[in-house]
Amino acid sequence: MVYSFKNHQTLILKQKRGNNLKNNDMFCDLETGVCGVGEEEDIQVIDFHQPKKTITLYYVTDPICSHCWAIEPVLRRLKEEYGHYFHFQTVLGGLLEKWHDGPIDPANGIYKPADVAGHWREVGEHSRMPIDGSLMIDNPVQSSYPSSRVFKVIQKHHGDEQAYTFLRRAREALFSFNQNISDIAVLIDIVNNLGLNGDVILHEAELPSGQDLLNQDFALVRDLGARGFPTIIFVNEENKGVKITGGRPLDVYIDGLKQALNTEELQPKKLPVVSALLEKEKCLFSKEIEVMYDVDQSDVRSFMEKELSQESFQLKEVLGEQYFTTST
């Protein structure tokens, strides 16, 4: 059998058998397991073309950005369905270095830590990505820089995917489970639960080199012209970009990707099965399942019970929202 791979096309030439087969070929069907005379043509042209990743998606964000937490369901589906069109790059922007006497976010009425609590709760209620926020009254996050530096150190040594997983776990801890992610002990625990050495990573994150890594992201944010969080920027190979600021519906991001690619049509990938997604994420909130699989809120529990074995997941609730975790 001869395979020729050129210009993403494959010409498959099947070897001829003996004359007694009368030009028919014998093969075993991969799906049915049945072996016999094949009905396919001897020569077929098959297109193995995969879209070339000519786009970079820059996701400008911060660990304590509540609106970034709110778009997690939409962003995950964008990556799962259309991630084969772009390279995904997280860029941290430094939302809060430290509290001071001046305004932090006057547009949202935030001048002191306690002002954050009400704003976060509103974002959580509107998005249905649960946010407690009460720690900002009695044990406020003092800075987003420590968790950002941890992200950069993990990214340096363990890659983008592991760093992004840390970012997700940190946001779960902060927003839904009310843990202070400017606390070194909390960060060490989150990193340890990823199977990494929290003490080693936190030590490096607190060195000047850790801040140097973060400063590189700050410089990129300035170059990209991002002025708020979240900002998503699609940049194509001609170095032209489409910038989308703030949390938007999925269709807006898809349209932005189409514009960057200069195409009218995209081919979405098949969505992952629920079991694989939950095993990867470890924790999924109801809203995330609704957005990923187009399920009504009232049907989420029955959907999960249908898709998963009873012993493979746990159903829990926080702030009036259901969420699902793996059993282990």
What residues fall within each predicted segment?
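The canonical Cys-X-X-Cys-His
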Residues: 65-68, 232-233
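N-terminal targeting signals for export/organelle localization
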Residues: 2-45, 312-316, 328
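C-terminal cap of thioredoxin/glutaredoxin-like
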Residues: 25-30, 34-35, 78, 172-328
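Structural alpha/beta surface segment adjacent to cysteine/selenocysteine redox centers
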Residues: 73-177, 286-289
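Extreme N-terminus of proteins, especially the signal/transit-peptide cleavage junction
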Residues: 46-54, 83
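Short active-site neighborhood of thiol/selenol oxidoreductases, capturing the structured segment around
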Residues: 52-66, 75, 88-92
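An acidic- and aromatic-residue-enriched active-site/binding cleft used to recognize and process polar
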Residues: 62, 93-95, 237, 247
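Secreted/processed peptides and extracellular or luminal domains of membrane proteins
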Residues: 41, 71-74
